[in-house]
Amino acid sequence: MKYLLLALALTCGWTAQAFNDDDVRMVKSMKKCVRCDLSGAALRNADLSNAILLGANLQSADLRGADLSNANLEQAKLRGANLQEAKLSGAYLSGAYLGAADLSGADMRDAQLYNADLTEAFIGKANLNNADMRQAKLIRADLSESNLIRADMSRSNLSAATLMGADLRLSLLNNAEFCNTTMPNGKVSYDDC
């Protein structure tokens, strides 16, 4: 029985660190890591501006305060990643998966989030001024008190999303889907249910 528990403990210890150390070194030094495994990596406050992380696996990564401005994160997997206060201005996140990610307080001005999946993401108090969020999945996402001025959310799915206190001035919401969506004034919209 002791050997079984030891084997389980060792196996769990090895699987807890999913990222590849070489990939972490490469992304920090060269700012390029295409389709690499950085899941669970500690990249807090890292300077990854202009990095090329196309298709990278950053699930559950700690990117709090990281500078990812103008980074290419197209098709990246960021499920459950912690991006609190991250700098993502001008970042390219088209087709990225950010389900359940924490983007609270993130600077996402001019970010390209076309067709990104932000299902159940927490995006409260984020700056999404002039962001391209066309066709984004924002199902059950929390965008409370976010700056969405001039954001293009055309054809986005905002079902069950929370926009309480968000600033939507000059935003484009053409054909956006609102079903059980809490609007900035606190009223719930069932327009597209």
Language model segments and positions:
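Positively charged n-region of N-terminal signal peptides that target proteins for export
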Residues: 1-5
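N-terminal signal peptide c-region/cleavage motif recognized by signal peptidases
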Residues: 13-15
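Tandem repeat scaffolds
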Residues: 19-193
